Amino acid sequence: MISRLSIDLQCLSYDLRGFGESQSQTETDVDRGEPTGGLTSHLLDTSSSQFDSLYTPTAYAQDLVALLQELNITSAWLIGHSLGGTIALWAAALMPDRVQGVICINAGGGIYLKEAFEQFRSAGQRFLQVRPRWLSQLPLIDLLFTRASVARPLDRYWARQRVIDFVVADPEAAVGTLLDSTTEEEVNRLPQLVSQLKQPVYFLAGADDKVMEPKYVRHLASFHRLFQYCADNVIEIPDCGHLAMLEQPDAVAGHIRAIVNGQ
């Protein structure tokens, strides 16, 4: 995706704390008692409970705040996939002057379905418990990841990368993000968060996404002023599942470029 966008746009990607090449940390600025600029004091009646865990979307948004400040990036569009979309939304709320807009890919929600979420959390925990390092060396294991959560098979290169990312993720971070991002409180907070954002927010949905179905993407998008009456801030990509940036990279890059350059 970056290879397509970097032709005319400056791009920066990073691994979430505890994933990829980012090491899991033991504390955030909030845990250390360092100031966060008071940006959350008036937002959504935010309470300190959001920061009790290192793995809430808000805690990860604080990481992004620190990153942009450290790199002295004063103007940026945030693009996030799935949970990354939620993190981008929170970061936009925390940095209204730095963040010019948000593009969420395969991200939505804002409706807490108790039974469905309990099943998802339980199954997810069991799945994450079986992640031996040797799994990535298992012959043909990547073939399984070419078809998981997608509408069209991925190239084996990307499937292989999915396997590696899966097995190297920090155990605490993997479980923590699963549990802390799917609580009733966290899910129900999303619509109000989106409704209060002043920046433009767009949502790219996969027409065949079974993880985050388009109807749930449209639901969350409907709380933003750009939704209007015709889902003007939602773009549905055909023949696409939950990994739009890998399944339909040209289409996604085209939409991102049009949105960013059109503002």
What are these regions (language model features)?
Residues C240-P249:
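Catalytic histidine-centered segment of alpha/beta-hydrolase-like enzymes
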Residues A93, G101-R133:
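Flexible "cap/lid" loop of the alpha/beta hydrolase fold
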Residues D8-Q10, T74-W77, R98-G101, P200-Y202:
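Structural signature of beta-strand start/N-cap positions in the alpha/beta core
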Residues L5, A91-M95:
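Aromatic pocket-lining residues of Rossmann-like dinucleotide-binding sites
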Residues S3-S6, L12-I79, G254:
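Active-site loop/oxyanion-hole signature of alpha/beta-hydrolase fold enzymes
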Residues S3, Q196-C240:
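Conserved loop-alpha-helix segment in the C-terminal half of the alpha/beta-hydrolase fold
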Residues G80-G84, A88:
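Gly/Ala-rich beta-loop-alpha elbow adjacent to hydrolase catalytic centers
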